[in-house]
């Protein structure tokens, strides 16, 4: 049986403005972390562990459930802008000054809006199979 950091790292919880975000941190906790933003109908268990584990060999990786998704509480926003705002609040709640964002599909739209709305928070974007963001 193959074990994965993405699935064996403990799920933690962070309370931010009435939302309890579920997340996992793993890899090398030095430097700027890589935060994965969710694709449509996804949660922190839906990212390919082969990819997240490979990236975690050289840096810290953070997977999370956005508001109202998976193990996180709150109400899932009905807009990409709302999802981006919640994701930005989560990143702020972790106390990160800067992060690299990896977004696939809808997660790419979320990541782009965070970068547009909060350029101070985003160092780099990795966009996979996504298009321009919808507000």
Residues of each region from the PLM?
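Alpha-helical elements of Rossmann-like donor-binding domains used by nucleotide-donor carbohydrate transfer enzymes
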Residues: 9, 46, 50, 82-89
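Short, well-ordered alpha-helices that flank and scaffold nucleotide-derived cofactor binding pockets
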Residues: 53, 57, 89, 116-120
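Active-site loop/oxyanion-hole signature of alpha/beta-hydrolase fold enzymes
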Residues: 62-102
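Flexible, active-site-proximal loop/turn residues at the rims of small-molecule/cofactor binding pockets
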Residues: 41, 46, 76, 81, ...
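N-terminal cap/lid segment of alpha/beta-hydrolase-fold proteins
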Residues: 2-20
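Conserved hydrolase catalytic core segment
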Residues: 97-135
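Conserved HGGG/HGGXW glycine-rich cap/lid loop of the alpha/beta-hydrolase fold
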Residues: 16-73
């Amino acid at each position: 049986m193959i074990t994965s950091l993405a699935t064996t790292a403990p799920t933690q919880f962070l309370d931010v403005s009435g939302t309890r975000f579920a997340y996992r941190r793993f890899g090398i906790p030095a430097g700027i972390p890589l935060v994965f933003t969710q694709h449509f109908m996804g949660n922190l268990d839906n990212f390919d562990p082969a990819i997240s584990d490979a990236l975690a060999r050289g840096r810290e990786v953070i997977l999370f459930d956005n508001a109202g998704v998976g193990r996180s509480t709150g109400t899932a926003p009905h807009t990409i802008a709302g999802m981006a705002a919640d994701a930005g609040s989560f990143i702020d709640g972790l106390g990160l000054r800067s992060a690299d964002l990896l977004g696939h599909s809808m997660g790419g739209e979320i990541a782009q809006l965070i970068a547009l709305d909060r350029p101070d928070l985003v160092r780099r974007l990795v966009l996979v199979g996504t298009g321009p963001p919808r507000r």
